[in-house]
Each structure stands twice: as C-alpha cells, then as structure tokens.
C-alpha cells in the first residue's frame, strides 16, 4: 500500500528551515543605497608634448619642461537609478569639443550618460593651453592626451564604486576674496579707443589719488563642501568636493635656476592640505576644490596700500590654500551623513547670441593690424592690436552658440555648472533663488564661453566685458542663464 501524498503546503513547511539556513549562509546583498568612487590622474604633458604653450596671459609663452605635476580629480556618485560625476582639471580653460569627446569615451567605458558627467577647469593660469585664448594656442597632441586622461579618470573612479554615505556643510573664509573690478573717477582709454568705461579691473593700489573709488560688486566668502565616506564599518573617509569663489592666485613655483613650472595653483595645494587635515595617512582619500562664481574676484585688496613685501614663487598659493582648507575642515566637522538620498540631474543647451563687431569696428581692426606693430617672441604687445586681432576672429563666430548648463541634486544639496567665468553676483543670486538648502555653482564646466557679466556690469565696461574670445556672449546672457537655472532647479525639486 502506497503512502498518501503529502500536501504541498506541508512540504513547503518542511523545507522552510532548510531554505532559511541556506539564505543565512549567503553573503548579505548590497543595499540599494548611495555609492561613490574616486580617482586622481596625472595630466602632466609627456616629454614628447613639450614645449607647450601655457594659458592665462594675453601673450603666448612656451614652457620647455616641468618638474611640477598637474592632475585631474574625479568623484563619481549616485544610486542604482542615477550616477553622475564631477571632474576638476588643472587647466585654465577647456573647450567644449574636447570635453564632449572625453565624456563620450567615459560614457562608453562606464555606461553613465554623457549628460550626467561634469568636467570643469580649475582656472589655474600655470597649465598647458587646452583652448585658444588671446595669443595662446593649444597643441592637438596635448588636447587628445587630455581628453583620454579625463575619460580614463572617470572610468577609474567608476570602477571603485562602493556603498557610501554623503553629507554637506558650508564654511566661510572672507580673508581671501576681493572684487577686482573698481569704479574709477579718472577716465581711461580701452583697447577699442573708447573713454566710456566706468570700471577698471585690477586698478592698482589706492595711494590717495582718488582714482579708485569703490568695488563694482560683492564677494562670496562661502566654502561649501560635499563629503563622502564609506558605508562599511569604520566609515572610512573617501572624498570631499569643495567650492570657493576665487579666480586663481598665480606666481607659481620656479626651479632653483628660475625656470617657470606648471602648477595646479591653490586648488592643487588645497587637495593636499585638506587631505592631511581630514584623512592623515590615507592615500585613497581625494579632496577636490572647484572654482565658484569668481569671474570678477581675486585675492588682492586694492582698497589700501600695497603690501610691505612680495611673495616668493608658490608662497601665496600655499597660504591661500591653507586658509581655505582650514575653513573647509571646520565645516567638515559639522557634516551629517546619510546612507540614502534622492539623486537627480538635468542638462540643457541654451542658445545665446554673440556680440559680433560692426563693419566700422572691423575696418578699425584691419587698419590697426596693417600699421607697423611691435612684436615680442611673435606676439603683439599693444593692447589695441591684441583686441583688433580678437575682433577679426569674433567676426567669424556664428551668430548664436549653444551654452551647456547642468544641474545636479543630491538630497537637499544642488550643484550647478556653467561654462562661463561667472560674475559673483550671479552665483549669489542663484543661491538665493534655489529651493534647496545648500547650493553652489562650479564655473568653467563642460566647455568655455567666456566671461559672464550682468547687463549692468556690461554697461560699466572694463576688461571682462571687452569683446574677445574671452568675452563674446550677448549682454543679456546672464539673465537668460539665471532663468534657465531656475527652471532646472524647479525640475530637480520635483524629481522623485
């Protein structure tokens, strides 16, 4: 006689203890929370790239070699639904074509959509030219090399993704930021022959002659930072992405023989100093400093007399970096971390007009350039000749250009990126308008479209408004960009 069949429910009940024991023996699955990875990649030109043209001056200069190293630093972060990245490059300016190619390669390597990748120049003035600027021109072999290194850095950071916790805080350092545009009472001629400019960049120290009256804009002393640590036991610190609205410092290190060196300016030194403060002995910790809305900001106070002493090469960079790192480290101690946060990002191209020269301005430029000129090492030396050359080049620009805007949300933190040297008051306006608790802007990201003054600053004139490859967008560009960012932030706020 055969035994009666066991009911299915009873069979399941008998197997349940075995199933439970099997599941307990399996490794715990990774939670669907936040993940992050980091990378630091050397972007110093290879021996075959030298001599290189360096950026940051109206005249081209050639560097035969260097003992200093320059880098790009990457942070990839997000959740299972959305990954995004921030890469800061020791470079003055990087054109969109180069960055689009780097992003395309990085997207192929990682699967992260190119529109989720943010790549920005720090704006050091001591790096190889990556974009044409005044009389400096990049070499194609270094541009190709740089695009590959940026893509590889993003891929390397992506390969190191691990569960993490993220938080943010805001410090302050008001000691290193001064508006470099000043109202002046004495008229001066600009390179286009006009005497109408009311504002002058870097006017010199006020020695009581009354020429310098008041700054033409505010400053932003904030030092916001995004902090990342491992979710594993021990909470190993992984990275910091900080932001400061200060153009650059300059006067890079030199060899004992006096030869100029490449340099990542105070941004590179911040990375080293902050890492020593926050994660001593940990070579895998990556500190990144991005440039905020600093198009009209430097660290020179023209309201009083000149300093009693000058700084040795590299000394001022170190002092500024240490000051900013101290402020960032104070904020770092107040970070509250979270293992799960909403992550979202949006991007758009905004078509903006180009300030093309009139025929009269073109004729004047041609007249200047066909008259006898002084040259130094193949460079025009007179400002009017330099800007005449720029006038003829801008004449060939299209009537409109696409300007890339990107915005990312990580919880109640919003990061905006713009391809312009953005005036500080624009950054402050966006912070005030943001629906998020903390917002900061990274400039010179995802391309290069010159200075971004407000319409009022355009009316006042001064270097940052003079038409050139460094300043060519329509006078209402800032108004349109702010409006676009408002819409993008509203879209991010509504994202699930």
Tell where the protein language model's regions lie, with residue ranges.
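Anionic-ligand-binding alpha/beta catalytic cores of soluble enzymes and soluble regulatory domains
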Residues: 324
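Bacterial N-terminal signal peptides
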Residues: 12-25
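Conserved beta-alpha junction segments in alpha/beta enzyme cores
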Residues: 32-120, 124-285, 290-319, 332, ...
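N-terminal secretory signal peptides that target proteins for export/translocation
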Residues: 1-12
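Boundary at the C-terminal end of the N-terminal hydrophobic targeting segment
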Residues: 25-32
């Amino acid at each position: 006689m055969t035994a009666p069949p066991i009911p299915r429910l009873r069979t399941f009940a008998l197997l349940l203890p075995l199933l439970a024991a099997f599941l307990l023996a399996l490794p715990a699955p990774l939670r669907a929370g936040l993940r992050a990875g980091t990378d630091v990649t050397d972007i110093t030109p290879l021996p075959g790239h030298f001599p290189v043209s360096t950026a940051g001056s109206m005249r081209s200069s050639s560097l035969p070699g260097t003992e200093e190293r320059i880098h790009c630093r990457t942070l990839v972060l997000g959740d299972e639904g959305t990954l995004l990245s921030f890469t800061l490059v020791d470079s003055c300016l990087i054109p969109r074509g180069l960055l689009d190619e780097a992003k395309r390669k990085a997207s192929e390597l990682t699967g992260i959509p190119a529109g989720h990748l943010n790549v920005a120049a720090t704006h050091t003035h001591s790096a190889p030219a990556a974009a044409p600027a005044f009389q400096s021109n990049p070499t194609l072999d270094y541009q190709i090399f740089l695009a590959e290194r940026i893509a590889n850095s993003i891929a390397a950071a992506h390969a190191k993704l691990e569960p993490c916790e993220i938080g943010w805080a805001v410090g302050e350092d008001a000691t290193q930021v001064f508006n470099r545009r000043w109202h002046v009472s004495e008229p001066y001629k600009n390179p286009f022959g006009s005497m109408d400019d009311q504002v002058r960049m870097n006017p010199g120290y006020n020695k009581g002659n009354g020429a310098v009256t008041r700054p033409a804009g505010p400053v932003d002393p904030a030092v916001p930072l995004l902090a990342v640590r491992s979710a594993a036991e021990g909470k190993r610190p992984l990275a910091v992405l900080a932001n400061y609205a200060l153009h650059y410092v300059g006067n890079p290190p030199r060899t004992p023989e006096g030869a100029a060196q490449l340099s990542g300016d105070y941004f590179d030194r911040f990375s080293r100093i902050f890492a020593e403060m926050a994660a001593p002995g940990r070579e895998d910790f990556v500190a990144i400093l991005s440039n905020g809305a600093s198009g009209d900001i430097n660290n020179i106070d023209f309201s009083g007399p000149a300093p009693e002493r000058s700084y040795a090469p590299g000394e001022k960079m170190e002092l500024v970096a240490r000051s900013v790192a101290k402020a960032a480290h104070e904020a770092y101690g107040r970070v509250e971390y979270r293992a799960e946060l909403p992550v979202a990002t949006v991007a758009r191209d905004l078509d903006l007009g180009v300030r093309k020269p009139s025929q009269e301005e073109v004729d004047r430029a041609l007249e200047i350039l066909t008259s006898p000129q002084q040259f130094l090492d193949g460079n025009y030396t007179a400002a009017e000749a330099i800007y005449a050359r720029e006038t003829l080049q801008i004449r060939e620009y299209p009537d409109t250009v696409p300007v890339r805007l990107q915005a990312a949300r990580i919880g109640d933190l919003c990061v905006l990126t713009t391809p312009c040297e953005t005036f500080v008051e624009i950054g402050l306006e966006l912070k005030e308008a943001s629906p998020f608790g903390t917002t900061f802007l990274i400039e010179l990201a995802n391309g290069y479209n010159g200075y971004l003054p407000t319409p009022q600053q355009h009316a006042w004139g001064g270097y940052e408004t003079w038409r050139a490859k460094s300043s060519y967008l329509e006078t209402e560009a800032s108004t349109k960009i702010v409006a676009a960012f408002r819409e993008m932030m509203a879209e991010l706020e509504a994202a699930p």
